[in-house]
Amino acid sequence: MGRIPCCEKENVKRGQWTPEEDNKLASYIAQHGTRNWRLIPKNAGLQRCGKSCRLRWTNYLRPDLKHGQFSEAEEHIIVKFHSVLGNRWSLIAAQLPGRTDNDVKNYWNTKLKKKLSGMGIDPVTHKPFSHLMAEITTTLNPPQVSHLAEAALGCFKDEMLHLLTKKRVDLNQINFSNHNPNPNNFHEIADNEAGKIKMDGLDHGNGIMKLWDMGNGFSYGSSSSSFGNEERNDGSASPAVAAWRGHGGIRTAVAETAAAEEEERRKLKGEVVDQEEIGSEGGRGDGMTMMRNHHHHQHVFNVDNVLWDLQADDLINHMV
């Protein structure tokens, strides 16, 4: 259960005191004294709280109060007792007749504390700052100092290890993302690579695409096989053959027996055939006989031609 309020706060006046209110309070206390602060506001004709009347009388209206600046003797007393009592302002003010605890506290915080700091004195311990630093260095013996240094170094190492570990993790994540691209980009990457390969083939002067020039002739039939025009009248190779030779072509070799049989058969038919071995780079017996046929009008899909679905191994068999 709390204390009963000293007054009705609805009709209480707040704020700065006026000179008329000070006169009413001072005259009433001079006649009746300070017996009951709850009844003084009502009996003195003041719309003030009892606590407000008490503080006003104690801090401002008492006849024994001193007003004005503090003297040097008063300052010396405040500093002396503050070094012993600390911030116990009421006890310090009791050593200064006519000064209130509120006046002493305000004067210390606004004046004396700054004055002592400017003189190189700690306002809390009332000792010179240089003396405090000497005490700190002498109080901590060398083992304690080294222990503190080791602790600080350990904290620094832990922090650096954390930063390095974090950076390594970030780099691993970047590398992982580079080696594992988004699956949605696989088709785009494949298309780009295919485009590069295609453009590289087209950029060459004697590109592989020239092999399929139907004007030079490429036919494979039941009776004859021709691959463009291997040699021209001036003895130079045709563009198709040059392209195959320039790009390495198909590594071929013609068995001598098969060539002899083919030549003998064509001679019987009255055809003149010139045999030439094309692309003699090393291989393991895989090859194809490339013959020159002077019929430039023949193409892949002649009406006399027959198309076969040949296996990969059939290309190395002898042609008869």
Swiss-Prot record:
One of its GO terms (cellular component) is nucleus. InterPro entries: Homeodomain-like_sf (IPR009057), Myb_dom (IPR017930), Myb_TF_plants (IPR015495), SANT/Myb (IPR001005). Disruption phenotype: Male sterility due to distorted pollen grains lacking reticulate exine on their surface. SMART domains: SANT (SM00717). Residues 257-283 are annotated as: Disordered. It comes from the Eukaryota. Residues 37-61, 89-112 bind DNA. The keyword Repeat applies. GO terms for molecular function: chromatin binding; DNA-binding transcription factor activity; sequence-specific DNA binding. SUPFAM superfamilies: Homeodomain-like. Keywords: Developmental protein, DNA-binding, Nucleus, Repeat, Transcription, Transcription regulation. It is found in: Nucleus. Residues 263-272 have a biased composition (Basic and acidic residues). Plants silencing MYB80 have the majority of pollen grains distorted in shape with reduced or no cytoplasmic content, display early tapetal degeneration with large opaque bodies in the tapetal cytoplasm, and trichomes on cauline and rosette leaves contain increased nuclear DNA content and produces additional branches. Transcription factor that binds to the DNA sequence 5'-CCAACC-3'. Regulates directly PME5, UND and GLOX1. Essential for tapetum development in anthers and microsporogenesis. Regulates the timing of tapetal programmed cell death (PCD) which is critical for pollen development. May act through the activation of UND, encoding an A1 aspartic protease. Required for anther development by regulating tapetum development, callose dissolution and exine formation. Acts upstream of A6 and FAR2/MS2, two genes required for pollen exine formation. PANTHER family: F14D16.11-RELATED, TRANSCRIPTION FACTOR MYB80. This is Transcription factor MYB80. It comes from Arabidopsis thaliana (Mouse-ear cress). The lineage of its organism: Eukaryota, Viridiplantae, Streptophyta, Embryophyta, Tracheophyta. The gene is MYB80.
